[in-house]
Amino acid sequence: MNNMKSTFLFLLTTTMMTCTAYGQSSNHKENKLPDWAFGGFERPKNVNPVISPIENTKFYCPLTKDSIAWESNDTFNPAATLYNGEIVVLYRAEDKSGVGIGHRTSRLGYATSTDGTHFQREKTPVFYPDNDSQKELEWPGGCEDPRIAVTDDGLYVMMYTQWNRHVPRLAVATSRNLKDWTKHGPAFAKAFDGKFFNLGCKSGSILTEVVKGKQVIKKVNGKYFMYRSEEHTSELQSPMFIS
C-alpha cells in the first residue's frame, strides 16, 4: 500500500504526462519544493505517454444521436485518485468534431492502474454532456479538466469545466465510485446573487490534508477552501463544497 501511495503522489505531481503534445525530457532532476509539498519525484524512462488517443473506441452520444470516436484526437489534463486499492485516472478526451482546442467536444474517460504506468481503460466515457440540467452549459464544448478530492467518508468531489463555447464555468460533481456521478452545476451560481455566473472560471483545486496516510478534503475555520484560476489565481471559501 505504501508503494501505491507513493505512486499516486507521483501521478498528482507530474499530472500523469498524458498529453501527447509534450515530449519526454531526458533530464531527470529532483523537484525542489517547500516542506509542505510532495517532492522528490522523477519522470520514469520509456513509459510516457501512458494514455494516448484511440481511433476505434466508439460512444453513442445522446445529443448528436450518433456513434462518436470520443477519444480520437486528444487525451490530456487528467485527475488521479485512489479507489479500492487501485489508481483511478479520469482524463479529458476530445473527438474530431472541430479544429483546435476549444472547438471540439470533451468528455471524461476512466482508466485504472496498479502500478501507475500501465493502465486499463473503459471503452466509453464516464462523464459527458447529456440531456440533463447542465446541457445548456456543457454543449457543444463538453466537460473538461477534472480535479478530484475525497472526503474522509469516501465521497469524491470533482471540480470540472463546463464549456458551451461561450463561457467556461467551473462546476461541481460528486460520486461514491468514480463512475456514477451527480452534477451539481456551476460552483458560483448562487454566490453574491449570481454575480459571478457569467465570469469565465476553471481549474478549481480543493484544499486537502493527509490524515492517517490518506489525502482528504480539509476544512479551514469550518469552511472548505479552494484555489481557482482563469487568467488569475484566487482563493475561495464555502461552507459547502457543492456551491
Regions found by a protein language model. Give the residues of each.
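Bacterial Sec-dependent N-terminal signal peptides
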Residues: M1-N27
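Beta-rich carbohydrate-recognition and catalytic domains
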Residues: Q24-N77, T81-G141, A149-S238, S243
